[in-house]
Amino acid sequence: MARAIQFTKMHGTGNDYIYVNTLRFPIARPEKAAIEWSAYHTGIGSDGLVLIGHSDKADFSMRIFNADGSEAMMCGNASRCIGKYLYEYGLTSKNVITLDTLSGIKILELHLEGRTVETVTVDMGVPLETDTIDFDGEFPFLSTQVSMGNPHLVTFVDDIRIVNLSEMGPKLEKHPLFPDRTNVEFAQITGENTIRMRVWERGSGITQACGTGACATAVAAHLTGRTGRTVNVVMDGGTLTIEWDEATGHISMTGPAVKVFDGTIELRE
């Protein structure tokens, strides 16, 4: 049986997802839909699928499925886009929205130009754990492990241009030290409180940007004495401003949310 599903493709600093309002269009097998629809040659093309739904604990809920069908705990770029979607499609008139995710309740603050959401600030909460990883000499670098509700491994290098991310990303993502796999970031300090970062996302591979990865990189940079608490993280798809509040310990992330197009696709269940 096939049904027509309305979707919106959006991106946050180039991290592109397919968004579906499951209050209108429920999807029974989102893992399958994510794999089929994310394919660039035979589907819509994206880094994954984001489902907007009901929550008893917040204004709305968010579920994220990577391009390989695995479910993600959290995505900062997707949460910003959801804020834009909810406001501009009339699901809410609030400019502060609570969002129920697998890594907890997130608070979105919308920054408007008239009736258009230009940027969104997300309270990403407190980094859950940090650790230094030396790989027992297997690799010629030290890395910092940071959890932002999902796992990240941040490595600082002198020149990010020489990093073969296609080779190192999957090696580190699937390293035995990380049985649940990890997201992988390589970063370079390029100026006072400015970081250049590239990312290999767990379940998606190389992407243009990663919001939680930018947050994890900012945390790692400050913990290792490289930057202050407010930084700009420059990624292939754009720049995010990350602030780590000293009083509360919370990380906030501010950046753009962009609608690409609306469409309808057939769902076979």
Swiss-Prot record:
Enzyme Commission number: 5.1.1.7
The UniProt keywords, alphabetically, are: Amino-acid biosynthesis, Cytoplasm, Isomerase, Lysine biosynthesis
Give any Pfam family that matches. Answer: DAP_epimerase
**Function field:** Catalyzes the stereoinversion of LL-2,6-diaminopimelate (L,L-DAP) to meso-diaminopimelate (meso-DAP), a precursor of L-lysine and an essential component of the bacterial peptidoglycan.
Name of the gene encoding the protein in the UniProt record: dapF
**UniProt: substrate binding residues:** 15, 66, 76-77, 150, 183, 201-202, 211-212
Organism (species): Bacteroides fragilis (strain YCH46)
Protein name, as recorded? Diaminopimelate epimerase
Gene3D superfamilies the record matches: Diaminopimelate Epimerase, Chain A, domain 1
